[in-house]
């Protein structure tokens, strides 16, 4: 993944500092830029892209931390972003509208009636093919990739192709 992007700086925060240090050590050869372990999540939110990989039930990514030109990816089925961030974002982009409305980052604001399907700007596919433009340099964008089977298959296909090109992997029989 890091080879696809020119990462100049990667900021990492974990409730458990030892876990953040281990991540830094594990990723040092994969990331060309500096990996900075932060002592609080606010410091880790500085950058073009903010990604939450967590099992947190606490809404720790604050509205006031995210500036125009940043995109936030709350990954998985958790609620990392405070409601104000979701409601004040310039655009919300999702991989699958139906799934994102019922679990993960958007669940609470949808359940409270504060966000509706028509508030979703686009799907990732709409943006990727140019049907729905974005101004990533000037907007606060929330992208909620809750996960779909189609996305898993597409990514698996890319990984498989690259593994073949590099002579990696092997075959086995399913029982």
Predicted regions and their residues:
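Short acidic low-complexity segments
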Residues: 31-47
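Adenosine-phosphate binding glycine-rich loop
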Residues: 85-175
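A short helix->loop->beta-strand "cap" motif at the edges of active sites that frequently abuts
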Residues: 7-8, 67-70, 89-90
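NAD(P)-binding Rossmann-fold cofactor-contacting core
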Residues: 3-27
């Amino acid at each position: 993944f890091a080879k696809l992007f020119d990462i100049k700086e990667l900021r990492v925060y974990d409730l458990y500092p030892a876990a953040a240090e281990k991540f830094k050590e594990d990723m040092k050869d994969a990331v060309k830029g500096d990996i900075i372990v932060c002592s609080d999540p606010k410091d880790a939110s500085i950058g073009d892209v903010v990604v939450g990989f967590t099992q947190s039930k606490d809404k720790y990514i604050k509205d006031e931390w995210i500036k125009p030109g940043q995109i936030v990816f709350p990954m998985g089925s958790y609620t990392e972003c405070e409601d104000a961030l979701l409601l004040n974002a310039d655009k919300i982009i999702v991989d699958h509208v139906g799934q994102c409305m019922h679990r993960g980052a958007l669940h609470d604001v949808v359940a409270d009636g504060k966000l509706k399907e028509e508030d979703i700007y686009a799907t990732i596919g709409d943006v990727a093919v140019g049907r729905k433009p974005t101004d990533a340099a000037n907007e606060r964008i929330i992208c909620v990739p809750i996960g779909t089977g189609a996305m898993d298959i597409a990514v698996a296909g890319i990984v498989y192709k690259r593994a073949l090109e590099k002579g990696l992997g092997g075959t086995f029989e399913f029982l």
